[in-house]
Every structure is written in C-alpha cells, then in structure tokens.
C-alpha cells in the first residue's frame, strides 16, 4: 500500500449558453514513492463533482 504524501484540489466552473453552471474538480494525489494519480469529477454542483472525483479514488467525503 502506497502512503499518500499530499492531495491537491482544483476547481473549474463553466457557464453554458443558458447560464447554467457546471463544475470539474481535479484531485492530484502524490505518493511518497513519487507516483502521481489524477482524478477528475464532473457535476452540475460543486459537491457532486467533488464526490465523483473522490469516488474514483475509492474514497468518500464526510
């Protein structure tokens, strides 16, 4: 099992032609071994996008 050194989060938001917002949350997980894992979650709310990104890692948020 790899040990996580850091998790960085970034958020991007876009508006469509009807002014509806959509979000992308990018998680960059760096392990002590130097391995880097990037997961992106998309959603129509910030929380939905975040939860999808963490789900790809097999993690959940509280």
From Swiss-Prot:
Domain of life: Viruses
Protein name listed in UniProt: Non-structural protein 3a
Source organism: Porcine transmissible gastroenteritis coronavirus (strain FS772/70)
Lineage: Viruses, Riboviria, Orthornavirae, Pisuviricota, Pisoniviricetes
């Amino acid at each position: 099992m790899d040990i996580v050194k850091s998790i960085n989060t970034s958020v991007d938001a876009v508006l469509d032609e009807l002014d509806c917002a959509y979000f992308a949350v990018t998680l960059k997980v760096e392990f002590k071994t130097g391995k880097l894992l990037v997961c992106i979650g998309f959603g129509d709310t910030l929380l939905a996008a975040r939860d999808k990104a963490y789900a790809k890692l097999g993690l959940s948020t509280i």
